[in-house]
From Swiss-Prot:
Family matches, as PROSITE patterns: RIBOSOMAL_S8
Source organism of this protein record: Staphylococcus saprophyticus subsp. saprophyticus (strain ATCC 15305 / DSM 20229 / NCIMB 8711 / NCTC 7292 / S-41)
Keyword Cytoplasm: no
Pfam family, any one: Ribosomal_S8
Keywords in alphabetical order: Ribonucleoprotein, Ribosomal protein, RNA-binding, rRNA-binding
Name this polypeptide is given: Small ribosomal subunit protein uS8
Family: Belongs to the universal ribosomal protein uS8 family.
Amino acid sequence: MTINDPIADMLTRVRNANMVRHDKLELPASNIKKEIAEILKSEGFIKNVEYVEDDKQGVIRLFLKYGQNNERVITGLKRISKPGLRVYAKANEVPKVLNGLGIALVSTSEGVVTDKEARKRNIGGEILGYIW
């Protein structure tokens, strides 16, 4: 089965695993998914990320993070730019998510970065999604 929107598939898998409080999840690997996974780790939304090479495209293994009383660290994920309706923002129009409590994933000419990093580097791009 082919996946038309692999980023939406990744966000949906994370959302579903988070809702049922799974410790880890696996998804097919790609370069953009690896960049998104590294951002999730650096921003503290997940514990760890592993890359497993196989004879096909490889697998990304994400280890989800929960609070002391098993509360979710990721409370929401939303895909913004979709294959049928792309959403772009200039450097001065990159949105803040919940007044800075969440992050926006921005695909730029320098790779996938957070909204804070895009504003700091003064670059715009495609708004992939929001995570809070």
